[in-house]
Amino acid sequence: MPSKAENLRPSEPAPQPPEGRTLQGQLPGAPPAQRAGSPPDAPGSESPALACSTPATPSGEDPPARAAPIAPRPPARPRLERALSLDDKGWRRRRFRGSQEDLEARNGTSPSRGSVQSEGPGAPAHSCSPPCLSTSLQEIPKSRGVLSSERGSPSSGGNPLSGVASSSPNLPHRDAAVAGSSPRLPSLLPPRPPPALSLDIASDSLRTANKVDSDLADYKLRAQPLLVRAHSSLGPGRPRSPLACDDCSLRSAKSSFSLLAPIRSKDVRSRSYLEGSLLASGALLGADELARYFPDRNVALFVATWNMQGQKELPPSLDEFLLPAEADYAQDLYVIGVQEGCSDRREWETRLQETLGPHYVLLSSAAHGVLYMSLFIRRDLIWFCSEVECSTVTTRIVSQIKTKGALGISFTFFGTSFLFITSHFTSGDGKVAERLLDYTRTVQALVLPRNVPDTNPYRSSAADVTTRFDEVFWFGDFNFRLSGGRTVVDALLCQGLVVDVPALLQHDQLIREMRKGSIFKGFQEPDIHFLPSYKFDIGKDTYDSTSKQRTPSYTDRVLYRSRHKGDICPVSYSSCPGIKTSDHRPVYGLFRVKVRPGRDNIPLAAGKFDRELYLLGIKRRISKEIQRQQALQSQNSSTICSVS
């Protein structure tokens, strides 16, 4: 084992290897490294490879006598293939420092941040970075796991550079790269194969990636086997469908491709269709079709009442009435009842169609004197409605003009029957008994349903029309007042900025009679949080200032009743203070109603709607938009800009 002093002697010239060839793990121009376990060198043989920080000296010579100053060699300019980012530089700096510390630890020296001080007093001190750890791009070392495994191999022996150099056998030396040889990049490792994807294109990960709406739920909730069709089975003229590899999930199909659900051949071949059965596969009113349009089986409903006071002038805009600000989305069904309606009923319906737009159609409308009711439904839901039936009741016999009475409209949607009644009861502060009589006449005289069968005849009563339907909404001008007089009510209205509505409702005649059970048996009303809707000065926000001084009251109401508890959920209940063309303020309610599947053995409406009104409303809507744009253009062109 040569001593440390002997290793510090200057090296003798050694035979050069052939040009253009560099041994792996060996520096160009340096003698080959001695393998571990080999016998010591014979006289005249090449000296073993030394650490880069100490020059090699032949054995048997006096170091002071043969020591010669070594001229420092300037480092070769590295060839940069690309600009390095701060992250790459930091990574290279950390890897270089860690490799230097590992090499110094193997030699038993202390880390010195990239330079090794020689211990000989006369030996020159210089820093040497291992060539294989250059910062050029083609000399990036392998991962730490590869380096650590190769450092521990016995072939590295006592040469501190052998482990590092052997970890990158294909990397050329920096001197060779500078000399003009083409850089040799290490072979790229093959990328890891991606995880296998299921044929279900409606998986949770893909739904998140494609941002599929959560409300577009699959109408086939049961599991089905995978469906894989060959391209040849689609026919020569039909392109391949992206749903060929889908397994029963139509959720992604409806959001990415089409709302039209594919029909499977095995479902067509199966003879599972039973007329009048709730379990019929593919039935128009069955559970599958209901789940396709309403996954939660809840339909959004808008019910409103307004006493127009016979005014011919309609408000310029009905957006606040039909499209309230608290509703983010339009409803599926709109039912509007009017008392003392305007003389031009067709104009009123046209304004409703114009406001709701082309997404809605007039399913049915009826009139009884000046009582109007209009029923608008989404255009794509008209196929699931039965025939619409109506009935009327007159409560004031002696009157030539039917201003008091009731109007009812009924139909079945899927398997749920609906009844809508709008009424105008007797007016007057003290005529509570007459209003109770109007209610009794209405529930007994309305003849509904006629042709459409009752969904549950065992729970129906011949004496009460409201018991023959699943969901009942009764709304109108009931004319029930606040008892106590104008002075008491005004005192409660003028207490402060926030009106004590519960204190006002303690004087309400309707709530008092409903608690007694004398009217609207089984009905409920949403919580009231708005001011009394009657009686206002026309065009103003002040209550009656005439000599009659009528007491402000909640005359306009919306009530509901259901055969099954919890089927009707009120969402909002309010009035429209912005519509001031009448002495009444419109009152509306938003509801969520549960719908059940039905049977196909009922008479259907067959998609009928008022097409003439639909076209008229759309033309009116377009013409107003054109007029608005022309007004904006004329305003911009007439603007005068003067510079003083």
From Swiss-Prot:
Biased composition regions of type Polar residues, renumbered to the chain: 107-118
Residue positions bearing lipid (S-farnesyl cysteine): C641
One GO cellular component, as annotated: plasma membrane
A GO MF term: phosphatidylinositol-3,5-bisphosphate 5-phosphatase activity
InterPro entries, per database record: Endo/exonu/phosph_ase_sf, INPP5E, IPPc
GO biological process: cilium assembly; negative regulation of phosphatidylinositol 3-kinase/protein kinase B signal transduction; negative regulation of protein localization to cilium; negative regulation of translation; phosphatidylinositol biosynthetic process; phosphatidylinositol dephosphorylation; response to inositol
Residues annotated with Phosphoserine modification: S99, S241, S256
Start-end of Basic and acidic residues biased regions: 78-90
Keywords linked to the UniProt accession: Cell membrane, Cell projection, Ciliopathy, Cilium, Cytoplasm, Cytoskeleton, Disease variant, Golgi apparatus, Hydrolase, Intellectual disability, Joubert syndrome, Lipid metabolism, Lipoprotein, Membrane, Methylation, Nucleus, Obesity, Phosphoprotein, Prenylation, Repeat
Keyword Hydrolase among UniProt keywords: yes
Residue span of region 13 X 4 AA repeats of P-X-X-P: 10-242
Protein localization: Cytoplasm, Cytoskeleton, Cilium axoneme; Golgi apparatus, Golgi stack membrane; Cell membrane; Cell projection, Ruffle
Regulation of this protein's activity per its record: Active in the presence of octyl-glucoside or Triton X-100, but completely inhibited by CTAB.
Stretches with biased composition (Low complexity): 152-163
Taxonomic superkingdom: Eukaryota
Tissue specificity: Detected in brain, heart, pancreas, testis and spleen.
Sequence repeat coordinates: 10-13, 15-18, 28-31, 39-42, 55-58, 69-71, 72-74, 75-78, 121-124, 169-172, 183-185, 190-193, 236-239
Positions carrying Cysteine methyl ester: C641
Keyword match Acetylation: no
Pfam entry (one): Exo_endo_phos2
Function: Phosphatidylinositol (PtdIns) phosphatase that specifically hydrolyzes the 5-phosphate of phosphatidylinositol-3,4,5-trisphosphate (PtdIns(3,4,5)P3), phosphatidylinositol 4,5-bisphosphate (PtdIns(4,5)P2) and phosphatidylinositol 3,5-bisphosphate (PtdIns(3,5)P2). Specific for lipid substrates, inactive towards water soluble inositol phosphates. Plays an essential role in the primary cilium by controlling ciliary growth and phosphoinositide 3-kinase (PI3K) signaling and stability.
Record-stated family: Belongs to the inositol 1,4,5-trisphosphate 5-phosphatase type IV family.
PANTHER family in alphabetical order: 72 KDA INOSITOL POLYPHOSPHATE 5-PHOSPHATASE, PHOSPHATIDYLINOSITOL POLYPHOSPHATE 5-PHOSPHATASE TYPE IV
Disease: Joubert syndrome 1: A disorder presenting with cerebellar ataxia, oculomotor apraxia, hypotonia, neonatal breathing abnormalities and psychomotor delay. Neuroradiologically, it is characterized by cerebellar vermian hypoplasia/aplasia, thickened and reoriented superior cerebellar peduncles, and an abnormally large interpeduncular fossa, giving the appearance of a molar tooth on transaxial slices (molar tooth sign). Additional variable features include retinal dystrophy and renal disease. Impaired intellectual development, truncal obesity, retinal dystrophy, and micropenis: An autosomal recessive disorder characterized by moderate intellectual disability, truncal obesity, congenital non-progressive retinal dystrophy, and micropenis in males. The phenotype is similar to Bardet-Biedl syndrome and Cohen syndrome Distinguishing features are the age of onset, the non-progressive nature of the visual impairment, lack of dysmorphic facies, skin or gingival infection, microcephaly, mottled retina, polydactyly, and testicular anomalies.
Protein name from the UniProt record: Phosphatidylinositol polyphosphate 5-phosphatase type IV
Organism: Homo sapiens
Gene name in the database record: INPP5E
